[in-house]
């Protein structure tokens, strides 16, 4: 939890901030959705098949890093199916009655979206299993000797779950999703399309070079791209510059301390501390957390994922190590590796 709070303070966090509205930039159909080509095409097939049969689509699980479009795709699925959409999140469903209230208010073939589904209470999961498999809800009414079991028939529905940590899902829950789909980081060219589209929707004049400058610093994440685009728009408006070109975008993002690889001050502090204090590693995560005055969860869940994905650090059995990419990015020369000296077999050295 602490890691999520820390990450939410970062401009380049892929997580949605409380009160942040990005609906204006969201695509409204699969045709408008950029990137995730195989996932998008497969979803189109499943949607068409469900509509042709007049049935609820099979349950869908989206998993992958935050900010890649899981919520947007869930809404698009409902829109393309021509059915209602109801959204909630795992932590908001506290007791079985909360889930029952949601499920009993669904119309036939509606889409129920549960974000952060890995954070569902295990007791809630037990109630969800028969609802997903048989469209039935088994509840215990009352307490003690007066308690009785009640079975409620539910309309057929499609559950769309989203998680950033699929490894935390229980096997029984994961196995009940007939359509598991992974979302991956976006290519720069895909983000250029997203940024260009976003600038049009925001009424912002942006050159192709300006769009690429924003895209390449967006950490492969559309949500980050949209956030950076808005901040660049602010700087350009105050400076009275239009259209926004690469020079203005670069100046604005430098002011925001987001460098050319999408790294921010926290990322650079992590890399610099490893280089300056520990010679590039290997160093344990607990030692790093203490050196950075951060919690271990923050280091593992907030700082490291993107650095590992981009090849700046690697995990080894002995700890974290900087790669050649990291040393180059820091403008430093890695220390020469000193191979361990083995004593001569016939020498008197211990």
Curated annotation (Swiss-Prot):
GO molecular function: ATP binding; ATP hydrolysis activity; four-way junction DNA binding; four-way junction helicase activity
Record: residues binding Mg(2+): 71
One Pfam family cited in the UniProt record for this chain: RuvB_N
GO biological process, one term: DNA repair
Ranges where the record places region Large ATPase domain (RuvB-L): 1-186
Residues annotated as binding DNA: 296, 315, 320
Region described as Small ATPAse domain (RuvB-S): spans on this chain: 187-257
Catalysed transformations (reactions): ATP + H2O = ADP + phosphate + H(+)
InterPro entries: AAA+_ATPase, AAA_lid_4, DNA_helicase_Holl-junc_RuvB, P-loop_NTPase, RuvB-like_N, RuvB_C, WH-like_DNA-bd_sf, WH_DNA-bd_sf
One GO location term (cellular component): Holliday junction resolvase complex
UniProt entry tagged with the keyword Heme: no
EC number: 3.6.4.-
Residues given in the record as ATP binding sites: 25-26, 67, 70-72, 133-135, 176, 186, 223
SUPFAM superfamilies found in the cross-reference section: P-loop containing nucleoside triphosphate hydrolases (SSF52540), Winged helix' DNA-binding domain (SSF46785)
Localization (cell): Cytoplasm
Keyword list, A-Z: ATP-binding, Cytoplasm, DNA damage, DNA recombination, DNA repair, DNA-binding, Hydrolase, Nucleotide-binding
PANTHER family referenced in this protein's UniProt entry, alphabetically: HOLLIDAY JUNCTION BRANCH MIGRATION COMPLEX SUBUNIT RUVB (PTHR42848:SF1), PTHR42848
Function: The RuvA-RuvB-RuvC complex processes Holliday junction (HJ) DNA during genetic recombination and DNA repair, while the RuvA-RuvB complex plays an important role in the rescue of blocked DNA replication forks via replication fork reversal (RFR). RuvA specifically binds to HJ cruciform DNA, conferring on it an open structure. The RuvB hexamer acts as an ATP-dependent pump, pulling dsDNA into and through the RuvAB complex. RuvB forms 2 homohexamers on either side of HJ DNA bound by 1 or 2 RuvA tetramers; 4 subunits per hexamer contact DNA at a time.
Domain notes: Has 3 domains, the large (RuvB-L) and small ATPase (RuvB-S) domains and the C-terminal head (RuvB-H) domain. The head domain binds DNA, while the ATPase domains jointly bind ATP, ADP or are empty depending on the state of the subunit in the translocation cycle. During a single DNA translocation step the structure of each domain remains the same, but their relative positions change.
Complex and partners: Homohexamer. Forms an RuvA(8)-RuvB(12)-Holliday junction (HJ) complex. HJ DNA is sandwiched between 2 RuvA tetramers; dsDNA enters through RuvA and exits via RuvB. An RuvB hexamer assembles on each DNA strand where it exits the tetramer. Each RuvB hexamer is contacted by two RuvA subunits (via domain III) on 2 adjacent RuvB subunits; this complex drives branch migration. In the full resolvosome a probable DNA-RuvA(4)-RuvB(12)-RuvC(2) complex forms which resolves the HJ.
Family, per entry: Belongs to the RuvB family.
Protein name: Holliday junction branch migration complex subunit RuvB
Organism: Rhodospirillum rubrum (strain ATCC 11170 / ATH 1.1.1 / DSM 467 / LMG 4362 / NCIMB 8255 / S1)
Lineage: Bacteria, Pseudomonadati, Pseudomonadota, Alphaproteobacteria, Rhodospirillales
């Amino acid at each position: 939890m602490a890691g999520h709070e820390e990450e939410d303070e970062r401009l380049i966090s892929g997580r949605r901030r409380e009160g942040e509205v990005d609906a204006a930039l969201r695509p409204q159909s699969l045709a408008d959705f950029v990137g995730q080509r195989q996932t998008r095409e497969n979803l189109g097939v499943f949607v068409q098949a469900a509509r042709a049969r007049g049935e609820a689509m099979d349950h869908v699980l989206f998993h992958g890093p935050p900010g890649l479009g899981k919520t947007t795709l869930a809404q698009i699925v409902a829109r393309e199916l021509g059915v209602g959409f109801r959204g909630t999140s795992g932590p908001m469903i506290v007791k079985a009655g909360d889930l029952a209230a949601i499920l009993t208010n669904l119309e036939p073939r509606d889409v129920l979206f549960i974000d952060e589904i890995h954070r569902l209470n295990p007791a809630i999961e037990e109630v969800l299993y028969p609802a997903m498999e048989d469209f039935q809800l088994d509840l215990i009414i009352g307490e003690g000797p007066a308690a009785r079991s009640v079975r409620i028939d539910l309309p057929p529905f499609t559950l769309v779950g989203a998680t950033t940590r699929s490894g935390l899902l229980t096997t029984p829950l994961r196995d009940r999703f007939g359509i598991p789909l992974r979302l991956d980081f976006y290519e720069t060219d895909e983000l250029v399309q997203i940024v260009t589209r976003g600038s049009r929707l925001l009424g912002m004049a942006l050159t192709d070079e300006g769009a690429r400058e924003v895209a390449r610093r967006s950490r492969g994440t559309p949500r980050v791209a949209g956030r950076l685009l808005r901040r660049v728009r602010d700087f350009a408006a105050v400076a009275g510059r239009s259209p926004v070109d690469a020079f203005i975008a670069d100046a604005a993002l430098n002011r925001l301390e987001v460098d050319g690889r999408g790294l921010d001050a926290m990322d650079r502090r992590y890399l610099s501390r490893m280089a300056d204090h520990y010679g590039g590693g290997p160093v344990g995560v607990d030692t790093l957390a203490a050196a950075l005055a951060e919690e271990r969860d923050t280091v593992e869940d907030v700082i490291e994922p993107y650095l590992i994905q981009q090849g700046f650090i690697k995990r080894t059995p002995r700890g974290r190590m900087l790669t050649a990419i990291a040393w180059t990015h820091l403008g430093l020369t890695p220390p020469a590796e000193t191979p361990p000296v083995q004593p001569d077999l016939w020498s008197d050295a211990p």
